[in-house]
Regions:
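N-terminal secretory signal peptides that target proteins for export/translocation
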Residues: 1-5
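Alpha/propeptide regions of enzymes that mature by internal proteolysis
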Residues: 28-392
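Bacterial N-terminal signal peptides
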Residues: 10-24
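Residue-level detector of intrinsically disordered/flexible regions characterized by low predicted structural confidence
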Residues: 6-9, 30
């Protein structure tokens, strides 16, 4: 006999009602969002261009983290011949003074083989006070310098003497001469200054310029979801930097094994599933830092759905923040507690769906790249189409 864990009948009924409303709404809306048209300047398709739309929720206008009002993204890509292929990506929660108008944040660590500066203060205080910077492993100090310099220059911060720079990284050392440390702080600051709302460039750009995913070219990916009005009408968006491996699954189909490229292939192989993924989650739902931490943890489900076993050498880090004015923190502002625990499940669903699609977009949008130690091919889109047609 299957037993339901004892967490309270009332809580259980709220969860059932929430998902019932969510499913009914998705059915009425045709279940899936409209197909996003290809950007005429970009030849590589997104997941939705291939008919892949994880989950049941609609996307926002841009199907990007910038569908959350106020969130801005900037890229700085550094490419010099085959030797230098790296960059930085900046995510700004809003366009004001981030230090004086702080957003609540939650942090989750999967496997901790990596460097995510500023994370301990985020865990302790539950807030962000700088842009989030993504870059390569050996450019983390330059990322910190960029975030600190930019913050100190903001009007109103003349007396600031401590800045918690938040910088995540993945190692792009195969396609990029990472030991050369070619990125300067002023280069990375350009990503902050250039950040804007609207469509977000994906694939081999910014911090994703030199990354590898499941043996193919990885990069930056993004996606978003809208909750129905009955469940708050909130928006949730995700941006990922993918540089990890495993046995790739696309919408449940075993693409990695079908294309004969996967972890442990020659031992069953010398395949390498190690690497890292950084996930940034933004939402306009009013959430406490505690519930943002819970939200961040759900991204690990999407990482697993794409085929990652979360290996020994993987650095899997997720940070989630809320832009809602009622939960922001200031020097003279007391935030509200935000949504109740019982209202979180639809947002958990949105986080899993958006993260999975963002990962696939990073993979599909990335181009073949000849780099420092060799060439990494982009995944064969036609082959993926054939596999999906055989495994509906």
């Amino acid at each position: 006999m299957t037993r339901i864990p004892h967490f309270g009948v009332a809580s259980f009924m709220v969860c059932v009602a929430s998902f019932s409303a969510l499913t009914s709404w998705a059915t009425e809306m045709g279940v899936l969002a409209e197909t996003v048209l290809l950007d005429p300047t970009v030849q590589r398709p997104s997941a939705r261009d291939l008919g892949i739309s994880p989950g049941i929720l609609r996307t926002g206008q841009y199907n990007a983290i910038t569908d959350v009002a106020g969130v801005a993204v900037g890229h700085m890509t550094l490419s010099k011949g085959t030797r230098v292929n790296t960059g930085a990506t900046a995510i700004l929660p809003h366009g004001g003074n981030l230090y004086r108008d702080r957003v609540p944040a939650g942090f989750h660590q999967g496997n901790g083989y990596g460097k995510f500066t500023g994370s301990t203060q985020v865990i302790e205080l539950g807030e962000l006070e700088t842009p989030i910077i993504l870059t390569n492993t050996l450019s983390v100090p330059q990322g910190m310098e960029a975030a600190i310099s930019w913050t100190l220059k903001q009007p109103g911060n003349e007396d600031v003497r401590s800045v918690n720079a938040v910088v995540g990284e993945t190692n792009d050392g195969f396609l990029n001469d990472i030991r050369g440390r070619h990125l300067r702080a002023e280069d990375i600051e350009k990503a902050i200054v250039s950040a804007k709302s609207g469509p977000v460039q994906q694939g081999s750009v910014g911090a994703g310029r030199g990354t590898i995913s499941f043996g193919w070219k990885g990069g930056i990916g993004t996606s978003s979801r809208l909750l129905p009005e009955e469940l708050g009408g909130f928006t949730l968006g995700v941006l990922v930097q993918t540089n990890y491996g495993g046995i790739l699954r696309v919408d449940g189909a075993p693409v990695g094994t079908a294309l004969d490229q996967y972890f442990m292939r020659e031992v069953i192989d010398k395949g390498d599933a190690d690497g890292s993924i950084i996930v940034i989650i933004a939402t306009d739902a009013p959430l406490s830092d505690r519930n943002l931490k819970r939200l961040a943890s759900r991204a690990m489900l999407a990482i697993g759905r794409t085929g990652s076993p979360v290996t020994n050498g993987s650095g899997d880090y997720i940070i989630a923040f809320s832009t809602h004015d009622s939960v922001r923190r200031g020097l003279d502002k007391t935030p509200s507690n935000g949504l109740a625990n019982s209202q979180m499940s639809p947002l958990f669903q949105a986080a899993v769906e958006s993260t999975e699609e963002a990962i696939l977009n990073a993979l599909f949008k990335a181009d073949t790249l000849r780099g420092h130690k060799g060439t990494v091919e982009a995944i064969d889109i036609d082959a993926v189409r054939e596999i999906l047609a055989k495994d509906p």
